[in-house]
Regions:
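Long, charge-rich, low-complexity alpha-helical segments
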Residues: 36-100
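Acidic, low-complexity/disordered tracts enriched in E/D and polar residues
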Residues: 1-53, 93, 100
Length: 100
């Protein structure tokens, strides 16, 4: 399974939290444009670490969890993988990430 940040989404990691937003809101819109815009979300420090593993290019969940296991020491690999997949899938469902 692969994940990536959508092309029209911006993610920033700050000290203590993360910020993800849909940049398409900042462009000109036609009057008949009925698309749903995602808005913005703040995530915790651990969520920001997870999202910072992604970019605009697809990345394997196993590669991501491999790196995360070096940061979240003491967490079982399968537990970390399950938590990461659940976390990423929330953002897929909300439209911030792509999955394939």
């Amino acid at each position: 399974m692969y994940y990536k940040i959508r092309d029209d989404v911006l993610f920033r990691k700050y000290q203590g939290h993360g910020y993800i937003t849909d940049t398409s809101e900042y462009r000109y819109r036609m009057l008949n444009d009925n698309r749903r815009y995602l808005g913005e979300k703040y995530v915790s420090a651990s969520g920001a670490i997870m999202l910072s593993m992604l970019s605009k290019f697809p990345r394997s969940i196993d590669d991501v969890v491999g790196e995360l296991s070096q940061i979240f020491i003491g967490v079982k690999y399968e537990t970390l993988k399950q938590d990461t997949v659940e976390f990423f899938n929330q953002f897929v469902n909300e439209g911030f990430l792509c999955q394939g």
